[in-house]
From Swiss-Prot:
The keyword Cytoplasm does not apply. This reaction is tightly coupled to the Na(+) pumping activity and specifically requires Na(+) for activity. Inhibited by korormicin and 2-N-heptyl-4-hydroxyquinoline N-oxide (HQNO). Pfam families: NQRA_2nd (PF24836), NQRA_N (PF05896), NQRA_SLBB (PF11973). PANTHER family: NA(+)-TRANSLOCATING NADH-QUINONE REDUCTASE SUBUNIT A. Belongs to the NqrA family. It is an enzyme of class 7 (translocase). NQR complex catalyzes the reduction of ubiquinone-1 to ubiquinol by two successive reactions, coupled with the transport of Na(+) ions from the cytoplasm to the periplasm. NqrA to NqrE are probably involved in the second step, the conversion of ubisemiquinone to ubiquinol. It comes from the Bacteria. It comes from Vibrio alginolyticus. This is Na(+)-translocating NADH-quinone reductase subunit A. One of its GO terms (molecular function) is oxidoreductase activity, acting on NAD(P)H, quinone or similar compound as acceptor. The keyword NAD applies. The gene is nqrA. NCBIfam families: nqrA (TIGR01936), PRK05352.1-2 (NF003759). Composed of six subunits; NqrA, NqrB, NqrC, NqrD, NqrE and NqrF.
Length: 446
């Protein structure tokens, strides 16, 4: 077991009940283009086209051969683009059950399948995009390979579902997915979990590792740091546990599996719980009559790293397993800094709220202050469990010093790895955005 002591479990109200329920009927689904780092689409459909489930919607011209497929059958009703014609989303009005089918196999055949057969089926179905590289967090090139694949079979994000509930419901598919991953690499498959019991693969290159401690103990970046540190030469891939199930379902049934169990939770959700929906589901449909009155912000993903789901982005993200909802914090409190703050959370124990152990807080979207200078008072070190100098690294990200940032470990990181640093920052800096700018520059300059 690997135990980390630094980190932070956010005490936010609205914890979901850990029972899986059926979600609302979904009328629209979408693929969100901006989720895929560096992707430049070549469109295969236009508005008005009828599509089958698993039909190709677009390919990536910067990563030749990588296909992005429809999560449901229906009619393309929107192709939304932003500044500089960046693809925001392809929206499908759900209708019918037609789907593209693929080869299916017996469970005993999976570990012996040829690697090219596996790659071809994953690419054609669109499931290849479930894999992400580290560094850079991009969809792997089809001809690339890795010696380490990390399966994130735990989740320490605030308000998250317990993965063991979902995995144990789909044990056969999960084991089949691990068998597929084991055949996809000449190295090891690291299944990273909490102390719970999960179905195990019989393949010799599949290892289980237990992590314990506060968030970010459940992040792929934390697991890689301790088990297979990445750099420009050592490239690892990561995948979440629900996509491992989808891999198994694809090869066992010959059909694309797009079901997703998500946590619908937060301080303004009427009945926080786990709901079964589909990848790309309209969050307007999913949250209909589920929220308390007032102005709220629906977030696809965690409250720490998710995206504001509004307009062309109001859909469940490809890599997200949560829908979090917060109240918009627009009210201003006179002399709020001088109040005892019984109902306020503070990492630095600035408010009385820290005295009441176990208290959950109705957090909002407010940043509790305006932008200001970066102040190194030890906050970053409290929440960074990785063996690096967070204050120096964050300073270099602010200054745009890519050489120094790379030397301090920036290539190991993804935006989610710096989310707690953003949360505890007195200067209100968005370190995830700064990290992405740094990584883009490093990749561009080689």
């Amino acid at each position: 077991m690997i135990t980390i002591k630094k980190g932070l479990d956010l005490p936010i109200a609205g914890t979901p009940s850990q029972v899986i329920n059926d979600g609302k009927t979904i009328k629209k689904v979408a693929l969100l283009g901006e989720e895929y780092v560096g992707m430049r689409p070549t469109m295969h459909v236009r508005v008005g086209d009828e599509v089958k489930k698993a039909q190709v919607l677009f390919e990536d011209k910067k990563n030749p051969g990588v296909k992005f497929t429809a999560p449901a059958a229906g009619k393309v009703i929107e192709v939304n683009r932003g500044a500089k014609r960046v693809l925001q989303s392809v929206v499908i009005e759900v209708a019918g059950e037609e789907q593209v089918t693929f080869d299916k196999f017996e469970a005993a055949q999976l570990s012996g399948l040829d690697r090219e057969v596996i790659k071809t089926q994953l690419v054609d179905s669109g499931l290849w995009t479930a894999l992400r590289t580290r560094p850079f967090s991009k969809v792997p090139a089809i001809e690339s390979s890795t010696k380490a694949i990390f399966v994130t079979a735990m989740d320490t994000n605030p308000l998250a579902a317990k993965p063991e509930l979902i995995i144990n419901e789909q044990q056969e598919a999960f084991i089949a997915g691990l068998d597929i991953l084991s055949a996809l690499t000449e190295g090891k498959v690291y299944v990273c979990k909490s102390g719970t019991s999960l179905p195990r693969s019989s393949q010799s290159n599949v290892e289980e590792h237990v992590f314990d401690g506060p968030h970010p103990a459940g992040l792929a970046g934390t697991h890689m740091h301790f088990l297979y540190p990445v750099n420009a030469e050592n490239v690892a891939w990561s995948i979440n546990y629900q996509d491992v199930i989808a891999f198994g379902k694809l090869f066992l049934t010959g059909e694309l599996y797009t079901d997703r169990v998500v946590s619908l939770a937060g301080p303004v959700v009427n009945n926080p719980r786990l709901v079964r929906t589909v990848i790309g589901a309209s969050l307007d449909d999913l949250t209909d009559n589920e929220l308390m009155p007032g102005e709220v912000r629906v977030i696809s993903g965690s409250v720490l790293t998710g995206t504001h789901a509004t307009g062309p982005h109001a859909y469940l993200g490809r890599y997200h397993q949560q829908v979090s909802v917060l109240r918009e914090g627009r009210e201003k409190e006179l002399f709020g800094w001088a109040m005892p703050g019984k109902n306020k959370f503070s990492v630095t124990r600035s408010f009385l709220g820290h005295v009441f152990k176990g208290q959950l807080f109705n957090m909002t979207t407010t940043t509790n202050g305006s932008d200001r200078s970066m102040v190194p008072i030890g906050n970053y070190e409290r929440v960074m469990p990785l063996d690096m100098e967070p204050t120096l690294l964050l300073r270099d990200l602010c200054a745009g010093d890519t050489d120094s940032a790379q030397a301090l470990g920036a290539l190991e990181l993804d935006e989610e790895d710096l989310a707690l640093c953003t949360f505890v920052c007195p200067g209100k800096y968005e370190y995830g955005t700064l990290l992405r700018e740094c990584l883009d520059t490093i990749e561009k300059e080689g």
